[in-house]
């Protein structure tokens, strides 16, 4: 769906039906504005980066669960508050914080990584153990980092976002909107270091002080995988995820002929982003 929306909204105008005109796509009610497709996801938004112009909006202010896209804020906040060469030592916070088969790189107690390695683990492998450890290091505690996340969201103009953890794992009190996630994703895509990490398809963490083997991380973001039906050659990277609670969520940036767009999809069916 994200591929369909980005840079293709005007093309699809002629295909729209009368049903779409009465849908929850607010941009379709703007006189003279290209009509966007009606999609199955509960909410979605496309925003032009430099002017923050809303190109497409469906329920963009509806409060929903953010899912794994939370890690975009986790990564951005870390880049803004640490050096890539800083060292991170795993404690029980990260090692014991992942339960129920959550995504991780199986980091071990007292294992040392650089911040750069941690951010690749978070963005490419969705590593919850590393996200928790980064949060403790940057914020003094996970709760302290979460407060920083919420403060930064307000600074970026978010009005309906509350973060409760740095991983995006389900929490009934954690919520956002498509519009707020677009603002957060814009700030991330505008960060050169974030883009470098997000658009990387593979990254190797060498042997550490504890682990004798390499960890080869493969980016699981479908829009960067040229063998996936969702592949989009102009994509600059992003995050996606799925849980039964949140449905499918996706945020990304794309650039074509000097135009930068931010796309957000929230609460789609499994595999539909």
Identify the function of each model-found stretch:
Residues 1-12:
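Sec-dependent N-terminal signal peptides of Gram-positive bacterial secreted proteins and lipoproteins
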Residues 158-159, 170-273:
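Domain-terminus/edge residues, biased toward the C-terminal soluble/receptor-binding domains
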Residues 13-179, 183-192:
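Active-site-adjacent loops and short helices of periplasmic peptidoglycan-processing enzymes
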């Amino acid at each position: 769906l994200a591929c369909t929306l980005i840079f293709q909204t005007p093309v699809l105008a002629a295909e729209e039906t009368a049903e779409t005109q009465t849908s929850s796509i607010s941009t379709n009610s703007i006189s003279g504005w290209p009509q966007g497709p009606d999609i199955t996801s509960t909410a979605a938004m496309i925003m032009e980066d430099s002017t923050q112009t809303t190109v497409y909006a469906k329920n963009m202010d509806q409060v929903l669960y953010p899912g794994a896209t939370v890690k975009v804020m986790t990564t951005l906040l870390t880049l803004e508050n640490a050096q890539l060469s800083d060292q991170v030592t795993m404690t029980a916070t990260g090692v014991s914080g992942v339960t129920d088969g959550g995504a991780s790189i199986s980091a071990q107690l007292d294992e040392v990584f650089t911040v750069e390695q941690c951010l690749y683990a978070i963005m490419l492998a969705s590593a919850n153990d590393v996200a928790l450890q980064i949060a403790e290091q940057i914020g003094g505690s996970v709760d302290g980092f979460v407060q920083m996340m919420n403060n930064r969201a307000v600074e970026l103009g978010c009005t309906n976002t509350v973060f409760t953890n740095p991983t995006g794992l389900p929490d009934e009190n954690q919520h956002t909107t498509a519009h707020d996630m677009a603002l957060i994703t814009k700030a991330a895509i505008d960060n050169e270091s974030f883009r470098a990490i997000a658009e990387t398809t593979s990254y190797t963490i060498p042997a550490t002080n504890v682990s004798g083997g390499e960890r080869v991380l493969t980016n699981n973001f479908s829009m960067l995988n040229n063998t996936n039906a969702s592949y989009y050659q102009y994509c600059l990277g992003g995050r996606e995820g799925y849980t039964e609670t949140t449905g499918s969520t996706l945020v990304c940036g794309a650039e074509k002929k000097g135009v930068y767009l931010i796309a957000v999809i929230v609460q789609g069916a499994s595999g539909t982003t």
